[in-house]
Amino acid sequence: MKITPCACAVALACTTAGPVLAQSQEEERLPTITVRSDKPRQTTRSTSDSALLLADQPGYATAAGGGVSALPVLNGFAADRLKIRLDGMEVTAACGNQMNAPMSYMPPAQVGYTRVIAGITPVSIGGDSIGGTIELSSPVPQFADEPGKLLSKGGFSVSARSVNSEVSASVNATVASENLSVAYVGSRSRAESYTAGNGDKVLSSLYESNNHALTMAARGDGQQIVLKVGQQYIPYQGFPNEYMDMTGNRSTFANLGYDRRYDWGMLHAKLYWQRTEHEMGFFSGERTGVMPMDTRGRDMGYTLRADIDLGQDGASVLRVGQEYHSFRLNDYWPPVSGSMMMSPRTYVNINGGTRDRMALFAEWEHKLDARWTTLVGVRDELVKSDTGNVQSYGTNMMNLPDLNAANAFNAREHARTDNNIDLTALARFAPDDGRTVEFGYARKTRSPNLYERYTWGRGGMAMRMTNWFGDGSGYVGNLDLKPEIANTLSGTVDWHSADSEGGEGGVPRWFVKLTPYFSYVQNYIDADVVGSFNTYGVAAAPGNLLQFANHDARLYGINASWKWPLLQSDGMGEIAFTGKAGITRGKRTDGGNLYHMMPFNVLAALEQKRGAWINRAELDYVARKTLVDANRREPVTASYTVVNLKSSYRFNQSITVSAGVSNLFNRNYADPLGGVYLSGLARARSGSLQALPGYGRSLDVGVNVSF
């Protein structure tokens, strides 16, 4: 089959990260070598939130949000400090609370492969970020294996959790010839508010999410073109650690990728677009009020990348490319009839916000000999941002702080331009089949996002509407912010078996890895105290008003992961001890702890595989968190241990049933990255502000059928 010149011309205006080559990230190592597999990533979690699929990755955690919108945290870096790529797309949160976080746009039913790279990211896949890269990729398009044959397959899955009465369902179908493929995935998830370990309902944590995606692909003559289109509709999603809830999120996207093999190497191209309509307010009796807040966002971008073979058998590859990303944002709050504070005008928070990035990069990966592999790269990125003039709700005394702030903001020039340089240098040394040492340095840069630079309100209510940290504080932007520059050193020592499960490229049958890291961040965007208030008017629940500000900071820690076979027999099958452990510290150089640093934690499991059975007993321990951010009044959280059990059985290669118990002993605990329980205080209107409670005991069941 031939792809028409017209189709090639359209596709060449863009790039992809290579859907021709399926990538599995079962190994977490510095990315001098890309591990490939035709098997999708498996998870031990029952979840409707893709951010939780990566819970077993060393150094990875999540900051609590809505039921499908947790924010990823990697070695202490969170949210915009991480590069999130969805099938190569870069999507921006169009919300001052990041309720529509990038990973929430790709539900677990659409995820086929994942990759997590902490800290030292190759310049070809990471810009405008300082903490690492997370990639979620759909399963690669499937085709019939011979001419004249028609491939048709599909399946469905249903799962349920008792802790929040969650029911999730998904369907998928594929029809393909040798050179053409069409696939559809649809999913829906709905849940009530969850119950904590003490039996109390965690108010305003209910949600519903609906997602649809259609993928069309064609291949032939060493090339492949893939078009993926889809929609998301979330009618409501509660956020118990924020002042507002999501009352609607609609998005539509299109993602076109093209790959072609030449004698000199590979050409990758991608063109993408996404539009988002987002609304905040209140939707249930669990938290009442009237305050509509609307945002409209649009992402558009492309990437062109050439992988040029400089040696035989991929021993030396030069990657050169160019990227462009454009983000448009309008954030406005309609007036509330009869309100003296929220009327008579529309509050304009971000007026025609623009953030455009243009990047060039070059990267050389070279295998020196059988033991040494190196990768070096440089990236130059121009970031331009701007916004229009703004206005407060009104001109009366209640609106005077915001009125004066709007006048001051409008009197200043808003346009900003940053020229950011990234550098990466990695080396991998494998003295034999059982040992690998990897180490590297990276300079990574991130420019402030639109909310960090351009939110302007000085009234307490307006400031509290900008907050993606779940800490109950209020925030205002800063036109004088500088880009963050992170200088990171990291290394990994990896002892492992010479053979792997699933053959070459699979997971070693046993391994032990240690990864220390250190980052010095110039102009880290933290926050300074500019005022205070009582949360919901409760004297025992004080909060701070903060302004984004640059401060130098240090982040450091160590991660460990392992897999160790304990027993293998005909009667018991294979039993292995697996897990991860880690600790992160973060401090400003002028004093004070950074927010949301994960204390010492261990996730350890005994896993048995016997025939069609997979059984897993898991222990999740988190130490007491005492090193907290005083400016944000971050709560101290107690240590806790949670036990989870899960089993699955596969019938005749097409039906899999699973059952498990999460938090077996119904432990009442607070996640150290959960933030504060605002919806609880909003209902009680008394007492102090508490840490957000974690999930109580849950019976989880599911079935997956393929045909």
Predicted regions and their residues:
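Outer-membrane beta-barrel translocator/receptor signature
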Residues: A94, A109-Y113, A118, V123-N198, ...
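Outer-membrane beta-barrel signature, preferentially recognizing the C-terminal barrel domain
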Residues: E242-D263, T295-G301, N349-R355, F409-L426, ...
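Transmembrane beta-strands of outer-membrane beta-barrel pores
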Residues: V158-N164, S177-N179, R188-E192, G220-G222, ...
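C-terminal beta-signal and adjacent terminal beta-strands/loops
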Residues: T445-R446, A527, R624-L627, Y649-F707
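Transmembrane beta-barrel wall of Gram-negative outer-membrane proteins
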Residues: A160-R190, G199-P235, M244-L267, A306, ...
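Gram-negative outer-membrane beta-barrel transporters
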Residues: K367-T374, L382-V383, G505-D526, V530-L627, ...
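Surface-exposed extracellular loop regions of Gram-negative outer-membrane beta-barrel proteins
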Residues: Y233, E277-E279, R328-N330, P335, ...
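Acidic, small-polar-rich N-terminal luminal/periplasmic segments of exported/outer-membrane proteins
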Residues: Q25-P147
